[in-house]
Amino acid sequence: MFFSLIIPVYNRPDEVDELLMSLSQMEYHDVYEIVIIEDGSTIKCQEVLEKYADKLNISYYFKPNSGPGDSRNFGMEKARGNYFIIFDSDCIIPANYLIEVENALKETYVDCFGGPDKALDSFSDIQKAINFAMTSFLTTGGIRGGSEKIGKFQPRSFNMGLSRRAFEVSKGFGNIHPGEDPDLSIRLWELGFETRLIPQAYVYHKRRIDWEKFAIQ
């Protein structure tokens, strides 16, 4: 299985630096690639990528701004792998992440999966509070944190896996935002693909929203 990590970014070089630092410490030793899609940024991350050129297999693409869903599709079209893993740029990836994903897919293969998110001790108080609110069953129902308490699991694109076949058949994310994540899940189900949660495939999600924006959700 050849993984391609798909990471759209918009004006977030500092986040990309933290994300790539975590990927440089991966315990996974098979070949994989990282595809960075710069979505029309005015503050580019190219200098950050140069720091990791001798440590990571990175492909970089700059394109006009068209939003996160279209940028993920662009990255998957350019990628060489047969299984794509999509991250937000504000995620930090545990060293055993790809090992856990590979083991889970070997045991029970699906064409689309999602994983939970957690907060690191180093996150700010507001980031920890928002993370709790987004992942607690008492608030959002635990959907974004990976709860299996309701219906079919709908992966979220901050931490999502998608096979090349499922991408090619579904054409990936639709041209809607927000709402592209559940839209993709529903279309995959209609096409006969299955989705699942991989509890061990969690990421540390350093959410960059504030209380005012969070209250709207």
What are the language-model segments listed below?
Residues 2-4, 33, 183:
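Cell-envelope/extracellular polymer assembly enzymes that use nucleotide-activated donors
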Residues 21-31:
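Short, acidic, metal-binding catalytic loop of nucleotide-sugar glycosyltransferases
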Residues 22, 38-47, 65-66, 88-94:
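A conserved acidic beta->alpha catalytic loop
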Residues 63-79, 100, 150, 154-158:
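Glycine-rich, basic loop-to-helix element that forms the pyrophosphate-binding segment
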Residues 84:
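Short aromatic/hydrophobic "clamp" motif used to bind/position activated sugar donors
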Residues 95-128, 201-202, 206:
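Conserved donor NDP-sugar-binding/catalytic core segment of glycosyltransferases
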Residues 119, 140-165, 176-178, 183, ...:
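A recurrent flexible, glycine/aromatic-enriched loop bordering the glycosyltransferase active site
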Residues 174-217:
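Catalytic donor/gating beta->alpha subdomain of glycosyltransferases that bind UDP-sugars
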